């Protein structure tokens, strides 16, 4: 068994073998894609090939894919110029002008969008999969209602893409954000999908100025290695999605069954409409932050919430949105599995977490 047991795949994923091979293959392709000589032309060809491959994975057109440095940048770019309606469980990179509430399971009742005052807003955004509790939202249904109100729709698909099917035409979204390191690509690269029809209605403005890259909409020299690695990583994730989800789901259910045998344990949210890799659980009287710290001493990597908020001793806004008290939210941990995990690792983690919960409770008495 590995010395390190990595159970925090919602924070980031290991670089997959397909992405590693692409990086090694193109390490010497250093030409600036904006240059007119042959080295630059070769780099442009690599970028456009990756754009086509990524577009195919989500049923988009190549010219609808714009490369960014991250999912957060893609989210910020998508929403920066618009008054936006969101939900109360969004990632912090999503600005909130008005929010639609979720139920105790973290799911948006899409019918609530019929009652929203759209008069002063131009865009609605809802994340496809929540980064803390793994809830899958009814994006297609929300988009239909939003469009019926003559509004535009964006979805943050950072936790969805590569893990559940994403078809932008089926979902009928106008914009969609993604981040490479959530599905096996290196950090520092993501993309924003912008539908061609949406661009006809709105004059898309750049968030980052300084050059004419990405059709003049994002300044800055492109991250060639990140881009050429992201394409095969996404292809690999899409190709093996069904079998990996089945395997990871079995591991998740076995681990969850063991953890729920601990007295005073509670699953946050529901297993229904949830990605197969996610567990968000709390233990009465046990600090989530303390449990995470102790697990680290045993080589187990878990989190007490979103990686973007680690180190902040405030209760999760997502857990509070589904009805938890501050104390219950602070007593929660997040475990997110990947296809690299083994049954042996899961059994070890269950055993260690059970013992640590007992230890923390004993120390508090």
Regions found by a protein language model. Name each.
Residues 1-365:
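Pyridoxal 5′-phosphate
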